């Protein structure tokens, strides 16, 4: 299903201080949930804690009622959670297509299903099709980020964690990335995304949380954030 619950989470430490101090949020199946906030608010730390790179000091993380707080990333991956970090998570020595095939191998599908997943990736990101036989080291930064996202999507995740999907990308590529996220949401994939592109995050998310200093400062459905966008942008970028 992909229902994620984070309850009173404290995690991530800098010089003995918790980055996340008391985070409670819900991500409903088949929705896009956006997380915004100023730099240093703990947004990326939240995704790392959910994926098992950081273990909570306090609190609980659960998927469909199952406690995953103490699981390692490879165990969480087996549950159908995929993580797209801010930097490109690809194998530079492999070609574009080999990276996608490696992602598809995770689900151990038959050849027809793998071919279908690759075709969907190429349809969503035509530049990857044009470069399918190039080594990943030859890609631009934007192309590498597209490949990083596509590689995780071919694993057919139940829950997708995406960190800063629009950072450093040209506007045209940002549109392609978000169009793909909306497409997979329509196919039932649950998405939790962090993005400094607040306008875009508000536009695509069904529900949003704004973090500040490791806590949830504001939450609500898209319409609430859209109605107060100027105030929210100011608070999210500068902190209140």
Residue spans of the language-model regions?
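ABC-type ATPase nucleotide-binding domains, specifically the catalytic core motifs of the NBD
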Residues: 14-15, 96-116, 124-126, 220
